[in-house]
Amino acid sequence: MLKGKSLLCLLDFSKQEIEKMMEVSFQMKNFHMLRSVPRSLDGKTVAMLFEKPSTRTRVSFETAIRLLGGNPIVLNKSDIQLSRGEPVEDTARVLGRFVDGIAARVLKHETLELLAKYSNKPTINLLSDLSHPLQALADFMTIKEKFGEYTSLTFVGDGGDNVLVSLMAFVAKMGLEIKIASPKEFKPRDDIMKRIEEEAEKSGAIIEFYEDPYEAVRGSKVVYTDVWVSMGQESIAEKKKELLRNYRVSVDLMRYASKDAIFMHCLPAVRGEEVENEVIDGPKSAVWDQAENRLYTAMSVLSLLL
């Protein structure tokens, strides 16, 4: 069903395909606990290309490849000819002759599209300026573990955030509900928001934007945030921080959520900026379980696509 496909954006997949990714993620977690992981990548090589630094994504993905019996090759941009001006298309053509799949963390989403097109090999988005699909899969895996179902959630912060785009894509495909508390200045790209809205209309999903974080969080079972300033946004850092200063997830804000609410963050966190220490280190925090689940969703996607 999924063999040979690329994972660039969750909007490219059907509800049934996303459900399959989630089902296999839970299976992989069980296999890992039992130390009986199927070696579905035996004899296969995956190139991992990084234009941006990575901790959780690199470690989880490289570990996933090895657990499945595959061979990861890690390529930092500074190590290869891309850093000297080689076109992405040429790099992709060459990698496609050597490896069975490509995974990349890139500055521009268009780079992923070129890698997929010219390598003719399954290509997996490890984060772009547009989206972070593997993160969203791990997030909803965590939510289902905590509540037994995919419950609604509230995102507090930058309304154009790349992780948020993937959360909205998952919600839109699966017919769920998400509230976004954000200054009106921050929204996803018009083209991607149009696709999300079209999918939401088909599935019955509810996606609502609020300017008041307290109103958005009221009664929510999941409160989610991300860093205010992403890599590559340093030139607008101070402006963003000023606009977002009232969108910090605090102990006070969490009081407005459901009594059994959890706090989520894709990490890394800037403590004291988008979240208070007392929240991320508190009893409602699910961030470490969330981070662990990155491994199992990576194993799922690799086994299904390659």
UniProtKB/Swiss-Prot annotation:
Pfam families: OTCace (PF00185), OTCace_N (PF02729)
GO molecular function: amino acid binding; ornithine carbamoyltransferase activity
Entry EC number(s): 2.1.3.3
Catalyzed reaction equations: carbamoyl phosphate + L-ornithine = L-citrulline + phosphate + H(+)
Binding site for carbamoyl phosphate: S54, T55, R56, T57, Q81, R105, H132, P133, L134, Q135, C266, L267, R294
Main EC class the enzyme belongs to: transferase
Residue numbers binding L-ornithine: N162, D226, S230, M231
GO cellular component term of the entry, any: cytoplasm
The entry's keywords: Amino-acid biosynthesis, Arginine biosynthesis, Cytoplasm, Transferase
Cytoplasm keyword on record: yes
Lyase is among the record's keywords: no
Annotated metabolic or biological route of this protein: Amino-acid biosynthesis; L-arginine biosynthesis; L-arginine from L-ornithine and carbamoyl phosphate: step 1/3
Annotated function: Reversibly catalyzes the transfer of the carbamoyl group from carbamoyl phosphate (CP) to the N(epsilon) atom of ornithine (ORN) to produce L-citrulline.
Protein's name according to its UniProt entry: Ornithine carbamoyltransferase
Organism of derivation: Sulfurisphaera tokodaii (strain DSM 16993 / JCM 10545 / NBRC 100140 / 7) (Sulfolobus tokodaii)
Gene that encodes it: argF
